[in-house]
Amino acid sequence: SKWFEYNELHKKHVLKIDVSFPIGQSEITHIPLEKREELYSAGLAIDQFLKHAEEEYGESVKYLLIIEGQASNDGYTGNFDLSYQRALSLYRYFQINRHLDLKRQNCEVLVCGSGTEGALRAYPDNASNTKNQRFLIHILPKPGIIN
């Protein structure tokens, strides 16, 4: 896919667009317009994927769409809140600015912030690496009944 790649280690599709926020910022307007347009295109790709899956499989296949904000490992005590605000900013951008609602019968949307935690961190994971001032989009199939 142009916008997503499958991460074999973590078993999930992950956004490929390189987006990062300035230090301490969470508003989508702090991301360059060109990157916001790419994010919108990725959102449209998600929407098309979900529509196709719904038409093809009906209720038998469900997905979990996670918009995860992250923060750099700089010791700031508000990193969890900041990372959540980054994810929420993208979700609102899709819904309000672009009228793109990714909630469907076959998809649950979660908006979360992992602060300085999470499995897919940019390395080295230190205070000077601002690449973790970003968000990730994960698309996961939901399993059936677990016995």
What are these regions (language model features)?
Residues 1-5:
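Long, contiguous juxta-domain segments that are non-catalytic but functionally important
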Residues 6, 52, 122:
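Sparse, context-dependent recognition of short Cys/His-centered cofactor- or disulfide-binding micro-motifs
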Residues 27-66, 95, 137, 144-147:
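Periplasmic peptidoglycan-binding/anchoring modules of Gram-negative envelope and division proteins
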Residues 29, 61-144:
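Periplasmic OmpA-like peptidoglycan-binding domain that tethers envelope proteins to the cell wall
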Residues 7-45, 71-77:
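Short, solvent-exposed beta-strand/turn patches at coil↔beta or beta↔helix junctions
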